[in-house]
Amino acid sequence: MTAVSAVPLANREPDGVRVAVVDETPTESEVTMRHGRRWAGGAAAALLMVTGLIGAAPSAAAAADAPALTAAVTAKLLSSVELSTAGAERDTRVTVSRSSGRWAFGTAVALAPRQEDAHPTGSIFIARADPAGWRVAFDGEAAFGELAAQSPLVTGPERSALTTAPTPMYAGGDYRTGMALPFAVGQTWTLTGGPHGWGGSAPYSSVDLAGGDQVVRAARAGAAYTMCQGWIRVIHDRGYSTDYYHLWNSISVNGASVGQGAFLGNTGTDVTCGGSATGRHVHFGLRQNSAYVPIAGHDIGKWVLANGAAAYQGGARHGSAWAGVGSGLYNYGALGLTQAVVDANGGGALTRRAGPGTGYGAVGSLADGVTVSVSCSANGTSHTGRYGTTALWDRLSDGSWVSDAYLWTGVNAPINGWC
């Protein structure tokens, strides 16, 4: 079983575009801009059409038209992220890492002010020059997958990762991630900061971790991208992606396929793209469908994150065991999508039975916190656990049955079909 909540993002529109660096011909170029934060109302709709077509009609050498492309990408970036410092100007950094004909691919980052609780925001973009202007899509959007499927710039395993259709937010009430903690399985690191915002505000999408061998690793397989120095994003399946910031010695990647546990860098205090950091750590954030989402309620490394009374508080739960801020989190590895963790709601053992209900004989027990594999589910007697009351029972891979009330599955429904 499981449960949680959500928060929308604000919209802003840029003005006063200033192109600082332009490289029109190579395969990778970077453009930095500065923008005020005046709200332009109706002008925003004119600049950023619902169709995603932005900017003047491109010339034949569309992908080399860096100023128009950069303006289009920047307009979309600043209208889709919440800029946290009122009245401030924000630098943006658009890097075109690949281009060919009418197509361009790269990263767009809104740099953060160098202050506490500030973090950069950004997206991976793909753009196509159409007669009406540049069509720009960001990772996690449905249009991104559509363009990635058509673009000659995206091939092989990367295309598979980028063309996965977005799922409903929080996977439609499904909080399974299939992720390990972002360090080696079997190590214990300290939770130095409980759930908090990527940029200091809601949603509380991120946690801070440090310790062990200080090597930061991919939480799940996917396609990896360098957003800026010290910041890596990995795009996974099921609409999820993960961000890793403040890294030292971070890898330089442009869509490389990485496996779960792949080296991304070391914990550090890097703030190349803004913000601040005290003491080496990794700022680990969870995204879905092009937006940061609350990390609370999701399982990472077989721990279920939970908010506290304020940002940076809270902790995580494995079975009935609780670990608050300052405690160690042991990386149990990824919980499979048809697996569950026993939560006896206070410790002790969970009785296994011969059928879906207490009317069936006991055939053994399971310790709190162990991982089980679910074969199928059926309705039986009703029970109340940590996450509520349910009549659902799960048949385990050994043929025995347990009440779903005492398992964390991430879903309030069968995770492997009905028996």
Where are the regions that the model predicts?
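Short beta-strand edge/turn micro-motifs at domain boundaries
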Residues: 122-167
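Surface-exposed, glycine-biased beta-strand/turn segments
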Residues: 148-231, 315-348, 353-354
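Short, non-transmembrane alpha-helical segments in secretory-pathway proteins
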Residues: 64-93
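Acidic, glycine-rich catalytic/binding loops that coordinate metals and/or anionic ligands
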Residues: 179, 210, 280-339, 404-419
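Secretory targeting and sorting signals
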Residues: 1-3, 20, 27-63
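Zn2+-dependent peptidoglycan hydrolase active-site motif and core
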Residues: 218-251, 272-281, 382-393
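Short, well-structured beta-strand-loop connectors
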Residues: 215-225, 252-268
